[in-house]
Amino acid sequence: MYGLVIEGVRFMIQENWGPQVLLQVQKLTSLSEKSVSTHDQYSEHVVPQMFKAIHEITGTPYEQIGVLAGRFFVQFLIRNGYGDLMNVMGRRFSDFIKGLDNIHEYFRFSYPKLRAPSFYCKSESEDGLILHYRSRRTGYLSYVIGQLVELARVFYQLDIGIQVLKKKEKGRFTFVVLKISFDNVGLGQDLKLKERVKNLNEYLPVDTKSFLQMFPFHIAFNKKLEILMAGQGLLNLMPNIQGLLMTDVFDLQRPCIKFTAEGIMVHQNCVFQIESLHPVVKQTEENITVQINDITEDKVSLEKKTVMDNEYESLPYVTLRGPITVLKSSETFLLLATCVVDTLDTMFKMGLYLNDFGESDCNREIIMATIQKSDTLKTMLENEKRRSEVLTEMTREISEAKKTARTLLTQMMPYEVAQTMMRSGSVDHCEAFECVSIGFIRVCDFSKISLFIEAFEVVNLLNTIYSHLDSIVDTHGVYKVETIGESYMISAGCPYRDDYDAEMVSDCCLEMVSHIKSFEYQSHDAVKKVLIKCGIFTGPVVGGVVGVRTPRYCLFGDTVNTASRMESSNQTPMTIQIGQRTKDRVEKQASGAFRIKPKGNVFVKGKGDMRVYEIEKKKGRARYKKSDPLRKKMVAEKKEAEELLDEDNEGHRSSALSRMSLGESIDSSSSRRGSLSGSQLELNKTIAQTIELTSKASAALDLNMQDENNRPPTWSASHSQDIRKPRKTESKITLNSRLSSSDLAVSRVETSKDSDGETPRPTSSELKEVNRIREEALAQEKEEERTTKEENQKIEEVGEDHVSEATSLLDSEVSHGDNNISFSQMPSDSIPHEDRTSLPSATPSEIGDAISKKKLEKEDSNSSMSSLDERTTVSAKPTTTRRLLNQKDLEKEKKRSSMAGSSVTSSSAHSHSIRSKKDTRDKSRCKCEDIRADNKLKTKVCSIM
């Protein structure tokens, strides 16, 4: 697997969870110490391990991680310049799926050892198609589904549905049948095209000579796969293939089916690729060997000799690629292939020349373009490759040195403390422990032994003894603190707290004494037997790291001094002396399992007389587990990581697996497709949920793609427009749309573009201002609704009741500034001066009309702006009500002649005041309609308002 896929997963983690999660995933997958190169190959287990690490860190379901990684990989390819290629691979989504293998072949130019999966389609209809997915890897189904969903959404604006009809994993191989549902609108056009081609066949006959010239590498074979005819270009390379079986000469590489006539009939829409089973090399008659017959010396034979520069060089194989057409009239299969070559050196070894290709074959141009490459560029690439190899070797050496340093650091101090130091780079560590058992072990009469042996023998003796003691310490799970000369210090309960600290140290010392009894030093005759003595004490201590150049983990406290005194005051070799605290704690933890003998009082320096005891032996087994779980877990994780890193990657080698074996394994275990099983239904349900959950993250990534800082330089503005075509379900943002701030951010893709053709991005302050204006508009709408409702209610009451009630409205009190003026009690000369000029000296109806108009103008001047749409709605209902009111006034005028004039006049005055209100609103309305008309002002609403 190439690093391009790993980089895509890292891109997904960075965009979706952030750099902290990415660092944690890299540490769990052993990728933190080296950079990933897109053109280097890595183990197939890296990506599944990354998915597993993401699941453990974030708790996201595994299937959802796979779908999300597939969707983000499409965006990653777009950012790296592959978007233009994928944008032109198919006019319709069905065409794109049919050409997936062609995309992989294109990538093979940059990634020559690519082991791509195989895709081919069946049962295409107007509602979708059936896709067969075959791969040499397992665990990538959700990853592929995510890619298909994102490709359809980004490039074709389609929301597709995917259902797993069949899934099988056999060894390292995966065979899946997917049903992809979408609106396949182009299928009818394809059927019409086939009908046109069928009609053209009657008018465009092709003679055999022209056909052979167009396809010099064609192969014709029958249903038994017998080769009937081959092109001249192929016969120049493989002259004796006619009459042989296709399966005896070639290996079917694509598609992943069994090489049979039935399989070819079913997969006619696929591009086939076959490769010769045996290498093809050029033969020449320049070197002639003469072989003399044993019977007659007259007869000689000439033998062609194969010319090869180096027998260890890679041998060339003939690779043919093209469609297979079925000739129904003769029941013959025709492979219209072209020969695929990589380099000129391969052509020379095979004996292939440019004129062997057809005149319309594009391989000529590709090969000529290869020849024209600059020699300087080749030299630079070779030098860069050598530098890269040197850098890789240096990186490997640095990694080994770091690994060794970590190992030494974890041996010098506790594992957790060492990890903290490696992460932070600081040596500041101090921790208090309430109850710790400390043990000291000393070699007896060491000064006398040193007199009889040389200095290097002394070192060798101590090293041998301490090595035996180290193995015992690891067994009981206690911690070796340090060695000072002939003294050996251990502890339990620190740095790892334990409820059986005293029992652990006591058991360890008993085993040490027992082991030393049977120990014999063979290197020197003067020292055969070695004796030790032990001292144990329990109490509180403080542990921490001291030193900078050579940091050490040390224990401090009175307990350490007392434990040392327990050992030094012990005068009996091969015994274990303990204090009162240790005795009480051992009896509590072991429940009388130890046989402890009192030794009376012993004078201890700095302590005076202390009661001491001697541990003789123990009966029964230990209540704790005799192992160091943390250290064993660390070793297991380290071993597992090293196995994953050192595992041989089969992708580094050229693929030699026959695709026929894949097809045979499929056919041998295939069964009829019936109803979906429960596991498949559950899988389809999970897939649908994960697609829906990952859609939001993918849409958010589209917004980031529109940012010019994130957009790659090769991504043109026109391509960005194609990518972001609005879907049918989307609508443009209006000023009075009730959207939250997050909805506004997601809908920015629908905002209009400026004169330069680029999408303007509103700032955060502008978005806040738009939200504020929207809230004010909503509040104003509610106020307008309330006012309109009150006015309509008053008008309806006037229409239903007696007309005289409408006249009484003129006598109502009207709020005017700080004073309440009643016109029924005040003469016209008592009206304020600012209002008197607007009142004519006319009939009371005209006076009421003017007063109502003045009142409405005051109300409108104090009210804020509202939306145009709501004003239009408000003005509709009073108009209808006014018409009903006028009709009722005319009817009542006939009945009451005395009151008709004043009533109708007052009613019409009130109606005229409403019209005046409408006119005033129309004049003072906001510019919302103009804002909608001018797209540039949509993000500048705050300045307009």
Curated annotation (Swiss-Prot):
SMART domains (UniProt xref): CYCc
Regions of compositional bias (Basic and acidic residues) in chain numbering: 721-731, 750-759, 766-804, 851-861, 886-896, 916-930
Predominant place of localization: cytoplasm
Gene: gcy-33
Start-end of Polar residues biased regions: 711-720, 732-744, 817-828, 862-884
Record protein name field: Soluble guanylate cyclase gcy-33
Tissue: Expressed in BAG sensory neuron.
Cofactor(s) this protein requires: heme
CDD domains: CHD
Top enzyme class: lyase
Subcellular location: Cytoplasm
All copies of domain Guanylate cyclase, residue ranges: 437-567
GO biological process: one example: sensory perception of bitter taste
GO CC term, one of those recorded: guanylate cyclase complex, soluble
Classification via InterPro entries: A/G_cyclase, A/G_cyclase_CS, H-NOX_domain_sf, Heme_NO-bd, HNOB_dom_associated, HNOB_dom_associated_sf, NO_sig/Golgi_transp_ligand-bd, Nucleotide_cyclase
